[in-house]
Amino acid sequence: MIKLFVGLGNPGPEYEFTRHNAGFWWLDAVARELKASLAMDKTYHGLVTRVTVNGQAVWLLKPQTFMNLSGKSVAALARFFKIEPQEILVAHDELDIVPGEAKLKLGGSHAGHNGLRDIHAQLGTDDYWRLRLGVGHPGVKSEVINWVLKKPSLDHRLAMDQCIARAITALPHLLAGDMDKATLLIHTSKPPRPKPPRPENTLPAVP
């Protein structure tokens, strides 16, 4: 089962609504679902809360170290409470997935994501779960930093919010350790296609 849920982002109001904070948005949704409130804990360099699910302690964490030092926070909590890498799920923004979609993944490269890069380094492994929340790609590599540090368009933000809400439905499976069911649910829960416009009532053409 997942014992540590981590949402990645940058602290501070100037970053709150930027694409890079998608992981924070998801973790906030998890906290609401579990009726939990996070509080700053300097020992773990982040906003933290502990809940009990079916007799098991579960931790929620939002590192407050800035993105490129996220691993410092994750490793501090995981090591103290003896949480194994495969019991950790990290939610983060993903350039290679369109807004409105998410993917669950175990292990693999950090793909240039500085938060994941530092978690890899601090844990000494890439063998942890990631929830990849699509934010889309600007189309030009040189614009990536500006892209993730800006607010998404209203349409993209709505799609991302809906995606986060759908991903929350997999939470019981994540907590139970049924990663296959969680993966299936997250990967198949795509936004519904918009309905085609209703045809207008028109009079028949006059011959």
Swiss-Prot record:
Q: Which domain of life is it from?
A: Bacteria
Under InterPro entries, the record lists: Pept_tRNA_hydro (IPR001328), Pept_tRNA_hydro_CS (IPR018171), Pept_tRNA_hydro_sf (IPR036416)
Query: Which UniProt keyword terms apply here?
Result: Cytoplasm, Hydrolase, RNA-binding, tRNA-binding
The processes (GO biological process) annotated in the record are: protein quality control for misfolded or incompletely synthesized proteins; rescue of stalled ribosome
Q: In this chain's numbering, which residues are marked as the site (Stabilizes the basic form of H active site to accept a proton)? A: 93
Determine if Cell membrane is one of this entry's keywords: no
Query: Which residues are noted in the entry as tRNA-binding?
Result: 15, 66, 68, 114
What would be one Gene Ontology cellular-component term for the protein?
A: cytoplasm
> What positions does UniProt annotate as the active site of this protein?
20 (proton acceptor)
NCBIfam families reported in the protein's UniProt record = pth
Can you name this protein? Peptidyl-tRNA hydrolase
